[in-house]
């Protein structure tokens, strides 16, 4: 029986960092679904498509692959261009589209099927893997999330202001919680963790307690 760990939460709540470390400690796969929406959002934005028929046409030309932890779109490896605030806005814009969500959900379900895997995003425990063995809902204040994202971008050499990042966080929250299709919400059976008051290590340990209790997995790294 596989152990599929679903980690959901708003933008900048630490999902990506936590999911990566957790997967590494457990020696299992890690899938960042938010990155997939950023990839498709930027691609469709560059194509300038808005209506469903045009989006459907463009999606039919896309081959999105997940190979050894990296994403490739039509054979080209995806880099840090998807981590900018603008890419986040594009992601939320197109994530409202049912056709886009269905396209990516199918790919995500195919990747995670019958695998020991950590999958993080905004609708993993509610839509992508509603029967996941472990569900975590990770939250933090908007200000704390903006500080984290701002530092992350600066460390990568991306020029951006704190105010710009905070505004993006606030906008993303509004878009993600109010969209009609698969809005961001806490699954009924998810464990809620507010990372505002915890270190990354403390969050990881809390999740590991849940995982090791529910799944037949062993720590590969301390």
UniProtKB/Swiss-Prot annotation:
One of its GO terms (molecular function) is dCMP kinase activity. It is found in: Cytoplasm. ATP binds at residues 9-17. One of its GO terms (cellular component) is cytoplasm. InterPro entries: Cytidylate_kin, Cytidylate_kinase_dom, P-loop_NTPase. Pfam families: Cytidylate_kin. It catalyses: CMP + ATP = CDP + ADP; dCMP + ATP = dCDP + ADP. Its main location: cytoplasm. The keyword Cytoplasm applies. Belongs to the cytidylate kinase family. Type 1 subfamily. HAMAP family: Cytidyl_kinase_type1. This is Cytidylate kinase. It comes from Thermosipho africanus (strain TCF52B).
